[in-house]
């Protein structure tokens, strides 16, 4: 390798572009070839002449001249001597910037280990040689010997313990063995030289073969792990062409001097880079060692010097990694080469990813209400500086100045010509504004500058929310785009009038807020006794004249002609109507403007205009809206006065009554009727209830005050500022406050801010206020860090193709919580592509085929058809090899169109999730710590009509009450019939491939009905383990059941309440199986009533239904037909309903068609919200076990009844398990283990009957929710951390069986129907949530705790994980009112799943247990299968975002994220290639990024120009 010459790339010969970047180990020869000379002296510069010393660290001969084209001694100056070497000083005459790239080297006297390969786990040198890191260090630091050749040496005299190669010996062992066996070839040495020789002598190929044999033969897992570690290192050396001995340094490279500068400060001092100090120590020690060796010094001294040299080199590469860090003059550790590149201040993040740029400036912002949407006000002073070069050119071009110098003078003097030219330059040159923190793409937008006087930038009020800016002193930065392409992109893509929709949710972001909302709201209000009320006007113009002449109030109700129709409206609303744009197709419907316009309504209006009119129309409309809002907010003269804050009279009586009720509860507690937690819960409930009552009264008062024109009410109601919760604090009562730990203080603040707080109340308030401020400060950092991790994991996701061709998808339904709709199916399916046909449940025809993109109209059609679940394509199921495809992503929410290839969807997703994170954290203190607890649920109520079906539900009867005895796997369903049996017969159910056939066999006939398999509710959905049941089919019979004619055999589930999520154990059921549930049925459409009866699976028309009839048969439907005789709506009329119209009557949408006959059964079940009862399953006699007063239970005396009750202590001695045992007549023993704080309701030896309550356990105390749970919860989910108390989850469906405990752990066995079983050992401290003999589904929790996402993936698969993660993450954001589209979370989740774990390596190069990216896995398997080999098998793994980002395929991207040294160590040994496919690595290398318009770089682009 001696022919390697010094390389220097001349400026013009630099490669303009390169395909890939590879990191390798440098061989000693390569280092020498890079070098321009050896650095022999530790000197830097001469302190008198300030010239660099020769052969020193800054030597000009080695590194190049200090001044351009000038040698050191001054013999050659000027450009004409370029390339000449001065004979006197040896310096080449060239530019001084070669000092940034020329390297030197130091020849070390002894080989030294590179600390990264010794100390970075796993230690690469140690792994290769198969010795421990500690031992390796002892050898390198001259504390121990390593055996180089064992010869025939033995440790003992019997010659049984052989000395092996690479054994590490201490001094005594070495001396002994050396004396005995030196003749027989024994040899051992210490230090870097021996390690280098051993590495050089390794035969990697034979080691590889040997390891592969070992791994096959060993059974121990631990051994396998170590072998695999070693295999990986050996393989990477073999594949990369690196040699192991290169990990030892013989030639130490010296960094170019301009990268470790030495700057002189005033006062004769110097600022020196730490690296120079570290190099000086290496050179000093190296020279001393050389001298000592020449002098033949004693071994011990030389050894010591060698050790010091090793330490000096260690400190240079990574100071403080091993021993104590080397400190400088000022007692702080010196910054080594590793520290220079890593961390926030390191090379990557400080200088490569975040550079300061020219042509930028910053200033304070003020509001610019007169600007257009796409304009910003730029101070002349700033513009002058920013556009200086443009200005100089323009002045010369126009002939005002002849030289640059003259032009500069003109600019300094600010002559009139300068201003004239500046106007011209700025006229068509957009600028970009940025507000830090730049959390999403809307934080940088382009504007056309308008030159203004003053020093502050003016910002359009509507773009404030996108920037999250306000005018309380915020600053913004201005950047000037320079190239033509950049200017074009600013105008086409980044102009603020183009960024109207938020990429996170597709909602408009430039919506009027605050004053503007207030103005428009005021304009749209109605007033009863106003001037000119109830008049009729001929046209809109006439109305305007009347208003201007003061003959008509803005708020008066009037009648006028609008677009050829008579409309009841007000003058104010007509003014709003006058600014609405003329849309080509569908003009804005009257219902959108002829009403009180609150913030939501204005947002909907903007959305509508955008969807139907496009960008330009919307931008113009928004400006008009802004002007209108400001104008009328000013005219309205709304202000706050103390008189607006009205305190209801009834407040004081409510508070007194509450105090009385609290006293009663305290007395009950004092007499032992209640447990402490029950007392606490009840008190908190009373005050919450009182607060709500007072608030309701107060809102009623304020709402009616000044007939709706109360200033405070207007502000809150319009959505301009404030909320009901805040008005409640002003005029109602402040309510309950929370402590910093989230628990509620039971003493409420009964005063409000108008009355003022007393000292105690003020003190209680400080808790919340202080917590708010502290949280804000802490969480902003967390949210920023989360964003950074998300960006890093998703930065390589871009749209790479139109369609990946997959048929897979994920089923989605509407999201409800406790029966309340959270997000409708319509919203969720909007902008997605179907992965399966959508079939109309009523007509069974295909509405939309697979591959259809769902827009607003189609989404509406889907919900109108009553479809409850749709299967859509998602990024998680996308099969594109890199990134995602357009179809799986759906629409780009920022544009509202299908996403185009090249869009950086990963970055958009990460920003969309990260950006609200900071808002979440900032949102805690707005409620000022006021506790928010809802009152507990006590019952479930039916919202729909139909009849009841029990699914697996078992009940006990006790005193004519029916008590639920199931703890799981049961439900009460509300259904309507879908298919009725046409005759008596036997039912048979067959499962075909995708279908289910329901067959009824009668005496002579047979009929078959075909259903789609996935339309049927699955058992785990019915049990509430996963998914939704609404809209699915239910078959209440099993194979072989007999059915009667007209009995319903297939039903549609309308509502489902499962046990235990919706109906707790031991609830009282109020409806029997088969009971009808009736409601008032509203028509819902205008049209003709037609009655039908269900026969088999079709509807048969019946005409004999009359008003007043009572329905007695299952299967009566009413259809309302519209003018074209098409079905508009269909309703099921249950039994016990009274019909209110005759057949073929005409009805309107608000008519009630049918009513319940009596006060219908609406309550399905009810229960005690505060405690969970323990119920006797059978009658028998009670016996106590481990229940001893004063030991495991305490006695609580009840004065009112004179009885005492036993309550289990909160903390029990270990091994004590208070239990009630019931022995039945048949001699069976039933055991009930009681939890702490349980109150016992039966005496020892008492007789109990079935379903009696024997004890009650209080439910846990409610803590008020705060986003503190939010942000940590989100990062916990994205990091895929296992929660502290992970729930143990059933892995298979089956029946629970308790086995005898093992080592004080409970043993649970699940027996599946096919005979397989799974066993779980559960710690005694955990609460077990299953009972013996119960049936559980895979994925159900067996113990308390949070579900770990890893378990979900392992047991239920990727789609279940998708459902779980998205619903958990969305829950946090929704609780804060933040809308984020699911697809963003899906992109991140798909990145967390981008690696797989090899289970079986087949014929591939993978090793079992390896984690590889899916892409590598697919490529390798394709390669093996092409040559006819066995492919590898892998299982999906879930990685947290940090792990996933560090495991990125790109070296540069991973290194710039975290754990830089580790990433670089691994990459250099494996000689990894980085193909520069993604964003981050290209930013770092300063290339065009390969997304968006960057995709078309170097391609020819045709541009079409629209003539119009």
From Swiss-Prot:
Mg(2+) binds at residues 470, 472, 474. It is an enzyme of class 2 (transferase). It catalyses: RNA(n) + a ribonucleoside 5'-triphosphate = RNA(n+1) + diphosphate. The keyword Kinase does not apply. Its EC number is 2.7.7.6. InterPro entries: DNA-dir_RpoC_beta_prime (IPR045867), DNA-dir_RpoC_beta_prime_bact (IPR012754), RNA_pol_asu (IPR000722), RNA_pol_N (IPR006592), RNA_pol_Rpb1_1 (IPR007080), RNA_pol_Rpb1_3 (IPR007066), RNA_pol_Rpb1_3_sf (IPR042102), RNA_pol_Rpb1_4 (IPR007083). It comes from Campylobacter fetus subsp. fetus (strain 82-40). Zn(2+) 1 binds at residues 71, 73, 86, 89. GO terms for biological process: DNA-templated transcription. The gene is rpoC. GO terms for molecular function: DNA binding; DNA-directed RNA polymerase activity; magnesium ion binding; zinc ion binding. It comes from the Bacteria. This is DNA-directed RNA polymerase subunit beta'. SMART domains: RPOLA_N (SM00663). DNA-dependent RNA polymerase catalyzes the transcription of DNA into RNA using the four ribonucleoside triphosphates as substrates. GO terms for cellular component: DNA-directed RNA polymerase complex. Belongs to the RNA polymerase beta' chain family. NCBIfam families: rpoC_TIGR (TIGR02386). Pfam families: RNA_pol_Rpb1_1, RNA_pol_Rpb1_2, RNA_pol_Rpb1_3, RNA_pol_Rpb1_4, RNA_pol_Rpb1_5. The RNAP catalytic core consists of 2 alpha, 1 beta, 1 beta' and 1 omega subunit. When a sigma factor is associated with the core the holoenzyme is formed, which can initiate transcription. Zn(2+) 2 binds at residues 804, 878, 885, 888. Binds 1 Mg(2+) ion per subunit. Binds 2 Zn(2+) ions per subunit.
């Amino acid at each position: 390798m001696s022919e390697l010459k010094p390389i220097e790339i001349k400026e013009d010969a630099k490669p303009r572009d390169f395909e890939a970047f590879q990191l390798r180990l440098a061989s000693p020869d390569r280092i020498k070839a890079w070098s321009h000379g050896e650095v022999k002296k530790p000197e830097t510069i001469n302190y008198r002449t300030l010239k660099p010393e020769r052969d020193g660290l800054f030597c000009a001969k080695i590194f190049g001249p200090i001044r351009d084209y000038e040698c050191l001694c001054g013999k050659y100056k000027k450009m004409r001597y370029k390339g000449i070497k001065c004979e006197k000083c040896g310096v080449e005459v060239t530019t001084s910037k070669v000092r940034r790239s020329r390297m030197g080297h130091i020849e070390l006297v002894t080989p030294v280990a590179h600390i990264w390969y010794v100390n970075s786990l796993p230690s690469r040198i140690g792994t290769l040689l198969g010795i421990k890191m500690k031992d390796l260090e002892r050898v390198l630091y001259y504390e121990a010997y390593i055996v180089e050749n064992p010869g025939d040496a033995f440790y003992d005299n019997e010659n049984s313990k052989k000395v092996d190669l690479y054994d590490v010996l201490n001094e005594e062992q070495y001396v002994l063995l050396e004396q005995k066996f030196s003749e027989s070839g024994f040899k051992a040495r210490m230090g870097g030289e021996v390690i280098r020789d051993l590495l050089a002598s390794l035969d990697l190929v034979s080691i590889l073969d040997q390891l592969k044999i070992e791994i096959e033969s060993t059974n121990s897992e631990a051994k396998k792990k170590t072998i695999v570690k070693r295999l990986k290192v050996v393989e990477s050396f073999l594949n990369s062409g690196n040699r192991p001995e290169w990990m030892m340094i013989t030639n130490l490279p010296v960094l170019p001097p301009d990268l470790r500068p030495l700057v002189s400060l005033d006062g004769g001092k110097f600022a020196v880079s730490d690296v120079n100090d570290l190099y000086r120590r290496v050179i000093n020690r190296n020279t001393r060692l050389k001298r000592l060796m020449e002098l033949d010094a004693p071994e011990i001294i030389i050894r010591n010097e060698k050790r010091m040299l090793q330490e000096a080199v260690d400190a240079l590469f990574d100071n403080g990694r091993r021993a104590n860090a080397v400190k400088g003059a000022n007692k702080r550790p010196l910054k080594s080469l590793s520290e220079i590149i890593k961390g926030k201040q390191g090379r990557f993040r400080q200088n490569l990813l975040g550079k300061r740029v020219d042509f930028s400036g910053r200033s304070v912002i003020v509001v610019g209400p007169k600007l257009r949407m796409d304009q910003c006000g730029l101070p002349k002073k700033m513009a002058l500086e920013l556009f200086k070069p443009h200005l100089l050119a323009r002045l010369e071009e126009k002939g005002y100045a002849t030289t640059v110098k003259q032009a500069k003078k003109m600019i300094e003097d600010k002559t009139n010509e300068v201003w004239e030219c500046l106007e011209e330059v700025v006229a068509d040159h957009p600028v970009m504004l940025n507000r830090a923190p730049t959390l999403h793409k809307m934080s940088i937008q382009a504007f056309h500058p308008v030159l203004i006087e003053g020093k502050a930038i003016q910002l359009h009020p509507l773009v404030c929310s996108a920037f999250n800016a306000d005018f309380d002193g915020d600053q913004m930065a201005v950047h000037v785009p320079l190239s033509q392409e950049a200017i074009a992109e600013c105008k086409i893509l980044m102009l603020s009038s183009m960024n109207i929709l938020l990429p996170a949710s597709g909602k408009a972001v430039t919506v009027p807020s605050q004053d503007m909302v207030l103005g428009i709201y005021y304009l749209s209000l109605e007033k009863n006794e106003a001037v000119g009320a109830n008049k009729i006007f001929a046209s809109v113009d006439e109305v305007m004249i009347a208003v201007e002449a003061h003959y008509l109030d803005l708020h008066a109700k009037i009648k006028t002609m609008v677009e050829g129709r008579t409309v009841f409206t007000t003058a104010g609303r007509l003014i709003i109507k006058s600014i609405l744009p003329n849309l080509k197709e569908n003009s804005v419907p009257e219902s959108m403007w002829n009403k009180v316009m609150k913030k939501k309504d204005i947002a909907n209006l903007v959305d509508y205009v955008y969807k139907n009119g496009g960008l330009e129309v919307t931008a113009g409309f928004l400006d008009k809206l802004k002007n209108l809002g400001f104008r009328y907010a000013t005219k309205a003269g709304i202000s706050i006065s103390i008189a607006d804050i009205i305190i209801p009279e009834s407040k004081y009586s409510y508070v007194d009554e509450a105090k009385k009720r609290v006293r009663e509860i305290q007395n009950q507690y004092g007499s032992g009727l209640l447990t402490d937690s029950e007392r606490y819960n009840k008190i908190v409930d009373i005050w919450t209830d009182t607060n709500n009552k007072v608030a309701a009264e107060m809102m009623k008062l304020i709402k009616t005050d000044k007939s709706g024109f109360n200033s405070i009410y207007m502000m809150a109601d319009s959505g301009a500022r404030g909320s009901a919760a805040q008005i409640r604090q002003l005029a109602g009562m402040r309510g309950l406050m929370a402590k910093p730990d989230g628990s509620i203080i039971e003493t409420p603040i009964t005063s409000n801010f108008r009355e003022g707080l007393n000292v105690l109340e003020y003190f209680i308030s400080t808790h919340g206020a202080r917590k708010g401020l502290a949280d804000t400060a802490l969480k902003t950092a967390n949210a920023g860090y989360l964003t950074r991790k998300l960006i890093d994991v998703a930065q390589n996701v871009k749209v790479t193709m139109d369609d990946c061709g997959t048929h897979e998808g994920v089923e989605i339904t509407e999201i409800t919580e406790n029966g309340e709709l959270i997000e409708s199916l319509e919203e969720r399916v909007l902008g997605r592509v179907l992965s399966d046909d959508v079939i109309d449940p009523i007509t069974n025809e295909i509405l939309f085929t697979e591959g259809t993109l769902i827009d607003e109209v189609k989404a509406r059609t889907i919900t109108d058809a009553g479809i409850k679940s749709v299967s859509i394509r998602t990024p998680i199921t996308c099969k594109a090899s890199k990134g995602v495809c357009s179809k799986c992503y759906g629409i780009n929410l920022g544009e509202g169109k299908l996403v185009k290839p090249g869009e950086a969807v990963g970055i958009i997703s990460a920003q969309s999730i990260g950006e609200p994170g900071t808002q979440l954290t900032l949102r805690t203190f707005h409620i000022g710590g006021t506790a928010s607890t809802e009152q507990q649920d006590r019952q479930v109520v039916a919202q729909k009509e139909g009849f009841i079906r029990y699914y697996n539900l078992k009940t006990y009867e006790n005193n004519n009450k029916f008590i639920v005895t199931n703890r799981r796997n049961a439900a009460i369903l509300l259904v309507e019939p879908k298919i009725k049996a046409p005759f008596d017969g036997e039912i048979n159910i067959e499962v075909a491939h995708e279908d289910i056939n329901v067959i009824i066999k009668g005496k002579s006939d047979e009929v078959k009905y075909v259903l789609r398999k996935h339309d049927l509710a699955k058992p785990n959905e019915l049990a509430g383990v996963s998914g939704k049941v609404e809209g699915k089919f239910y078959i209440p019979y099993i194979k072989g059941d007999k059915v009667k004619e007209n009995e319903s055999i297939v039903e549609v589930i309308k509502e489902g309440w499962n046990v235990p999520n919706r109906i707790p154990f031991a609830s009282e059921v109020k409806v029997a199986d088969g009971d009808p549930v009736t409601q008032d049925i509203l028509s819902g459409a205008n049209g003709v009533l037609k009655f039908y009866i269900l026969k088999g699976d079709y509807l048969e028309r019946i005409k004999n239904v009359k008003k007043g009839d009572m329905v007695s048969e299952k299967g009566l439907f009413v259809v309302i037909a519209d003018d074209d005789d098409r079905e508009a709506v269909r309703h099921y009329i249950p039994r016990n309903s009274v019909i209110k119209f005759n057949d073929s009557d005409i009805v309107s949408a608000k008519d009630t068609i049918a009513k319940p006959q009596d006060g219908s059964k609406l309550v399905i079940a009810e229960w005690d919200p505060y405690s969970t009862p323990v119920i006797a399953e059978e009658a028998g006699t009670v016996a106590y076990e481990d229940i001893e007063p004063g030991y495991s239970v305490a006695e609580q005396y009840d004065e009112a009844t004179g009885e005492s009750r036993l309550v289990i202590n909160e903390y029990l001695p270990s091994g004590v398990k208070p239990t009630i045992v019931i022995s039945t007549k048949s001699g069976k023993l039933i055991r009930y283990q009681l939890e702490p704080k349980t109150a016992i309701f039966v005496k020892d030896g008492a007789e109990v009957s079935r379903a009696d309550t024997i004890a009650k356990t209080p439910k846990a105390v409610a803590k008020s929710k705060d986003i503190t749970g939010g942000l940590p919860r989100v990062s916990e989910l994205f990091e895929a951390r296992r929660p502290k108390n992970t729930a143990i989850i059933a892995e298979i469906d089956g029946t629970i069986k308790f086995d005898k405990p093992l080592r004080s752990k409970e043993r649970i066995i699940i027996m599946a129907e096919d005979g397989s079983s799974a066993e779980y050992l559960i710690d005694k401290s955990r609460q077990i949530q299953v009972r013996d003999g119960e049936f559980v589904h895979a994925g159900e929790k067996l113990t308390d705790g949070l579900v770990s996402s890893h378990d979900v993936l392992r047991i239920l698969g990727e789609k279940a994980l998708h459902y779980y993660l998205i619903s958990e993450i969305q829950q946090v954001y929704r609780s804060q009112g933040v809308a984020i589209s699911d697809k963003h979370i899906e992109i991140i989740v798909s990145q967390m799943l981008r690696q797989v774990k090899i289970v079986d390596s087949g014929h591939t190069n993978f090793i079992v247990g390896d984690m590889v990216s899916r892409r590598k896995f697919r490529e390798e398997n394709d390669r093996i299968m092409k040559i006819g080999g066995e492919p590898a098998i892998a299982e999906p793994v879930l990685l947290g975002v940090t792990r996933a980002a560090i495991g990125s395929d790109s070296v540069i991207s991973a290194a710039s994220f975290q754990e830089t040294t580790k990433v670089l160590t691994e990459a250099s040994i494996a000689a990894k290639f980085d193909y520069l496919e993604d964003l981050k690595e290209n930013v770092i290398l300063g290339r065009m990024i390969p997304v968006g318009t960057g995709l078309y770089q170097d391609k020819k682009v045709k541009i079409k120009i629209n003539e119009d």
